[in-house]
Amino acid sequence: ARGSTCAVFGLGGVGLSVIMGCKAAGASRIIAVDINSDKFAKAKELGATDCINPKDHKEPIHKVLIGMTGYGVDYSFEVIGRIETMVAALASCHYNYGVSVIVGVPPAAQNITFDPMLLFSGRTWKGSVFGGWKSKDSVPKLVADYMKKKFVLDPLITHTLPFSKINEGFDLLRAGKSIRSVLTF
Protein backbone atom coordinates (compact mmCIF):
# COMPACT_ATOMS: atom_id res chain seq x y z
CA ALA A 1 0.00 0.00 0.00
CA ARG A 2 1.15 3.55 -0.66
CA GLY A 3 3.31 4.90 2.15
CA SER A 4 3.66 1.53 3.88
CA THR A 5 6.71 -0.10 5.40
CA CYS A 6 7.55 -3.59 4.13
CA ALA A 7 10.07 -6.28 5.02
CA VAL A 8 11.03 -8.95 2.50
CA PHE A 9 12.70 -12.06 3.90
CA GLY A 10 14.77 -13.74 1.17
CA LEU A 11 16.36 -12.10 -1.84
CA GLY A 12 16.17 -14.73 -4.54
CA GLY A 13 14.17 -14.17 -7.71
CA VAL A 14 10.82 -14.22 -5.92
CA GLY A 15 11.96 -11.96 -3.09
CA LEU A 16 13.39 -9.42 -5.52
CA SER A 17 10.11 -9.54 -7.43
CA VAL A 18 8.27 -8.81 -4.18
CA ILE A 19 10.53 -5.78 -3.68
CA MET A 20 9.61 -4.59 -7.17
CA GLY A 21 5.93 -5.09 -6.33
CA CYS A 22 6.24 -3.17 -3.05
CA LYS A 23 7.91 -0.31 -4.89
CA ALA A 24 5.24 -0.31 -7.60
CA ALA A 25 2.55 -0.22 -4.89
CA GLY A 26 4.15 2.91 -3.42
CA ALA A 27 5.75 1.55 -0.25
CA SER A 28 7.84 4.27 1.40
CA ARG A 29 10.26 1.89 3.09
CA ILE A 30 11.27 -1.57 1.88
CA ILE A 31 13.61 -3.52 4.14
CA ALA A 32 15.38 -6.45 2.48
CA VAL A 33 16.45 -9.29 4.78
CA ASP A 34 18.89 -12.03 3.77
CA ILE A 35 21.88 -13.92 5.20
CA ASN A 36 23.79 -13.36 1.93
CA SER A 37 24.90 -9.72 1.90
CA ASP A 38 26.08 -10.11 -1.69
CA LYS A 39 22.42 -9.83 -2.71
CA PHE A 40 21.95 -6.36 -1.21
CA ALA A 41 23.19 -4.32 -4.19
CA LYS A 42 20.59 -5.90 -6.49
CA ALA A 43 17.87 -5.46 -3.85
CA LYS A 44 18.67 -1.74 -3.60
CA GLU A 45 18.77 -1.43 -7.39
CA LEU A 46 15.22 -2.84 -7.52
CA GLY A 47 13.78 -0.66 -4.75
CA ALA A 48 14.91 -1.76 -1.29
CA THR A 49 15.60 1.22 0.96
CA ASP A 50 17.40 -0.79 3.65
CA CYS A 51 19.18 -4.15 3.70
CA ILE A 52 19.95 -6.19 6.79
CA ASN A 53 21.71 -9.45 7.41
CA PRO A 54 20.39 -11.30 10.50
CA LYS A 55 23.90 -12.69 11.07
CA ASP A 56 25.13 -9.15 11.76
CA HIS A 57 22.86 -8.76 14.80
CA LYS A 58 22.77 -10.36 18.24
CA GLU A 59 19.04 -9.76 18.62
CA PRO A 60 16.43 -11.84 16.78
CA ILE A 61 15.63 -10.28 13.41
CA HIS A 62 12.05 -9.38 14.34
CA LYS A 63 13.38 -7.25 17.22
CA VAL A 64 15.86 -5.58 14.88
CA LEU A 65 13.02 -4.70 12.49
CA ILE A 66 10.82 -3.39 15.30
CA GLY A 67 13.76 -1.28 16.47
CA MET A 68 14.30 0.07 12.95
CA THR A 69 10.66 1.02 12.48
CA GLY A 70 9.66 1.83 16.05
CA TYR A 71 6.57 -0.36 15.89
CA GLY A 72 7.02 -3.11 13.31
CA VAL A 73 6.37 -3.21 9.59
CA ASP A 74 3.01 -2.85 7.90
CA TYR A 75 3.67 -5.84 5.64
CA SER A 76 6.18 -8.67 5.70
CA PHE A 77 6.80 -11.28 3.04
CA GLU A 78 8.55 -14.59 3.74
CA VAL A 79 9.81 -16.07 0.48
CA ILE A 80 12.38 -18.54 1.79
CA GLY A 81 10.23 -21.42 2.97
CA ARG A 82 11.75 -21.77 6.45
CA ILE A 83 9.39 -22.24 9.39
CA GLU A 84 11.54 -20.11 11.72
CA THR A 85 11.62 -17.27 9.22
CA MET A 86 7.85 -17.43 8.77
CA VAL A 87 7.36 -16.86 12.50
CA ALA A 88 9.99 -14.09 12.52
CA ALA A 89 8.22 -12.38 9.61
CA LEU A 90 4.93 -12.44 11.52
CA ALA A 91 6.59 -11.17 14.71
CA SER A 92 8.17 -8.28 12.77
CA CYS A 93 4.75 -6.88 11.84
CA HIS A 94 3.01 -4.04 13.64
CA TYR A 95 1.19 -5.71 16.52
CA ASN A 96 -2.19 -4.09 15.82
CA TYR A 97 -2.56 -4.30 12.07
CA GLY A 98 0.54 -5.77 10.40
CA VAL A 99 0.06 -8.36 7.66
CA SER A 100 2.54 -11.16 7.04
CA VAL A 101 2.37 -13.12 3.80
CA ILE A 102 4.00 -16.53 3.43
CA VAL A 103 5.15 -17.13 -0.12
CA GLY A 104 8.02 -19.55 0.46
CA VAL A 105 7.10 -23.24 0.52
CA PRO A 106 8.62 -25.27 3.38
CA PRO A 107 9.78 -28.85 3.02
CA ALA A 108 6.94 -31.36 3.33
CA ALA A 109 5.68 -32.54 6.71
CA GLN A 110 6.75 -29.52 8.77
CA ASN A 111 4.50 -27.89 11.33
CA ILE A 112 4.59 -24.29 12.47
CA THR A 113 4.78 -23.66 16.22
CA PHE A 114 4.32 -20.07 17.34
CA ASP A 115 2.99 -17.90 20.15
CA PRO A 116 -0.72 -17.33 19.41
CA MET A 117 -0.46 -13.87 20.99
CA LEU A 118 1.27 -12.83 17.78
CA LEU A 119 -2.16 -13.03 16.14
CA PHE A 120 -4.48 -12.06 19.01
CA SER A 121 -3.11 -8.54 19.07
CA GLY A 122 -4.34 -7.85 15.54
CA ARG A 123 -1.73 -9.12 13.13
CA THR A 124 -2.87 -11.06 10.07
CA TRP A 125 -1.05 -14.09 8.67
CA LYS A 126 -1.80 -15.35 5.20
CA GLY A 127 -0.35 -17.57 2.54
CA SER A 128 -0.05 -16.82 -1.13
CA VAL A 129 0.50 -18.94 -4.18
CA PHE A 130 1.21 -17.16 -7.46
CA GLY A 131 0.80 -13.81 -5.74
CA GLY A 132 -2.83 -14.55 -4.97
CA TRP A 133 -3.71 -14.21 -8.64
CA LYS A 134 -5.87 -16.59 -10.59
CA SER A 135 -3.60 -17.89 -13.31
CA LYS A 136 -6.32 -18.23 -15.96
CA ASP A 137 -7.15 -14.54 -15.78
CA SER A 138 -3.96 -13.04 -14.46
CA VAL A 139 -1.20 -14.57 -16.59
CA PRO A 140 -2.48 -12.91 -19.79
CA LYS A 141 -2.66 -9.57 -17.95
CA LEU A 142 0.82 -10.09 -16.53
CA VAL A 143 2.23 -10.84 -19.99
CA ALA A 144 0.42 -7.84 -21.48
CA ASP A 145 1.77 -5.56 -18.74
CA TYR A 146 5.29 -6.88 -19.34
CA MET A 147 4.96 -6.30 -23.09
CA LYS A 148 3.81 -2.72 -22.35
CA LYS A 149 6.94 -2.34 -20.19
CA LYS A 150 4.93 -1.66 -17.04
CA PHE A 151 7.63 -3.63 -15.23
CA VAL A 152 11.02 -5.06 -16.15
CA LEU A 153 12.42 -8.55 -15.64
CA ASP A 154 15.87 -8.07 -17.16
CA PRO A 155 17.50 -7.15 -13.81
CA LEU A 156 16.55 -10.61 -12.51
CA ILE A 157 18.48 -12.38 -15.28
CA THR A 158 22.08 -12.73 -14.14
CA HIS A 159 23.36 -15.46 -16.46
CA THR A 160 22.75 -16.75 -19.97
CA LEU A 161 24.06 -20.27 -20.47
CA PRO A 162 23.88 -22.87 -23.23
CA PHE A 163 21.56 -25.75 -22.38
CA SER A 164 24.59 -28.03 -22.07
CA LYS A 165 25.55 -26.06 -18.92
CA ILE A 166 22.21 -26.51 -17.14
CA ASN A 167 23.95 -28.08 -14.13
CA GLU A 168 26.21 -25.05 -13.85
CA GLY A 169 23.08 -22.91 -13.71
CA PHE A 170 21.76 -24.93 -10.77
CA ASP A 171 25.16 -24.73 -9.06
CA LEU A 172 25.12 -20.92 -9.39
CA LEU A 173 21.60 -20.79 -7.96
CA ARG A 174 22.44 -23.03 -4.99
CA ALA A 175 25.57 -20.99 -4.25
CA GLY A 176 23.54 -17.77 -4.18
CA LYS A 177 25.48 -16.35 -7.15
CA SER A 178 22.58 -16.22 -9.57
CA ILE A 179 19.06 -14.86 -9.51
CA ARG A 180 17.73 -16.37 -12.72
CA SER A 181 19.60 -17.99 -15.58
CA VAL A 182 18.32 -18.21 -19.12
CA LEU A 183 19.20 -21.36 -21.04
CA THR A 184 19.76 -21.09 -24.77
CA PHE A 185 19.29 -23.96 -27.21
UniProtKB/Swiss-Prot annotation:
It is an enzyme of class 1 (oxidoreductase). Its main location: cytoplasm. Belongs to the zinc-containing alcohol dehydrogenase family. Class-I subfamily. The gene is ADH1. Pfam families: ADH_zinc_N (PF00107). NAD(+) binds at G10, L11, G12, G13, V14, G15, D34, K39, V103, G104, V105, R180. One of its GO terms (molecular function) is zinc ion binding. The keyword Transport does not apply. It is found in: Cytoplasm. It comes from the Eukaryota. Its EC number is 1.1.1.1. One of its GO terms (cellular component) is cytosol. Keywords: Cytoplasm, Metal-binding, NAD, Oxidoreductase, Zinc. Its cofactor is Zn(2+). It catalyses: a primary alcohol + NAD(+) = an aldehyde + NADH + H(+); a secondary alcohol + NAD(+) = a ketone + NADH + H(+). One of its GO terms (biological process) is retinol metabolic process. Binds 2 Zn(2+) ions per subunit. The keyword Amino-acid biosynthesis does not apply. Homodimer. This is Alcohol dehydrogenase 1.
